[in-house]
């Protein structure tokens, strides 16, 4: 439609996904371009040109957006190659014109925390890491993240940014499927090469005047992330990294970072030291729980529930390396859990590989409820908490397009909304440390769950409440998380790492994902506004439901 508005004579568009193709035809008609734009309901690589083809003649301008986080991961090379071979005249204009992938070697112990499990220390080493894991290069997949949100003091560039791959989309140079580049460059600083930051940019025009840039020093509002490739220790080569230690396959990078969180580990260790004695017999119900080894090091006998095969293999390595095979028994199935008479303490971080939003880790509560409530437990309480926020960018993933560049796209909004209402959960998981937001209210409790008592499967919980809005702004979301109370003094949170102050930016835990409710209708709020909410919990199946509504008081 932009091309039609600029005066193009003939325009052919293609869309293979039937619901979107149908919607596109409707939008083209509603904006008055049905006589100028022909939509072909197939992939561009399936289109043919000729008398009985999809196009009567070749085009002289190509406009396409087939890029992803790694630039060419969505079939960009084959798409452009086919277009030049079949759909375009020679010397056609291609938008974008060129693409460049950049890389920069950096030193960062924070980034390294996402890649390799480190020993747990408390003055001395409590849990050592197997050499296989220490030497492993990690997963082959890059780690997508918003590098603009990584604090500048947490990494040191060791080399200048380098263009490693250049792609000429214009057709003047061939696009190769297999390409390898070796670069020789001088370091700008001494240090340990922990990782490679990678990003890309696009030259949109033939004169290289219009640049679409994804550069990590500039906060990006686009839906692309920069990404990280982590370097194998003390090895310089061009081989594809492959995990051979099980840990990188079993656990996400977020979980690996969580296992390396020193502050978090110290709180657990302090709480466990007060609770565990050499006579303790503990059941640990958490996937990939290194703290189970800490409990064993404190002298207790441990039953460790590990239902996931990959996680179980990883934990077996840790148990063997730390010489704890005589104190830790790994249990593969819930059916094989020890009898109540065999244990006197149940522990969980809690964390489960299958959990997406934080409260799904309440599976710990359900597992402990198989035992009498007289058996001591940790944590003792779970508090689901929330705060009203103004996101800087995250709300755009749910925001309607409305009118964009002068075109009415409301039909697309309706299609997406109907689909979203059928398939999307009103609360989704997001790593909020990557998405800036300011607090519009104080943090508030939704529900406190006493984990020392067994689940009452017959009790339906429904709670309502209101909280005041304490700062003016645009309330476009609610952030939700869980605080786990370990004992009367110590707790760990999967939410903010600092006290929430209304009107100030919230600092979130970088090693967990929080729950987010994004409003479909965004409200401008003042200190006269309130947030009303309701929460429903069905213990029979573990289902929870959140509802939020902004009330504006004149």
Each language-model region and where it sits:
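Class I SAM-binding transferase module
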Residues: 1-554
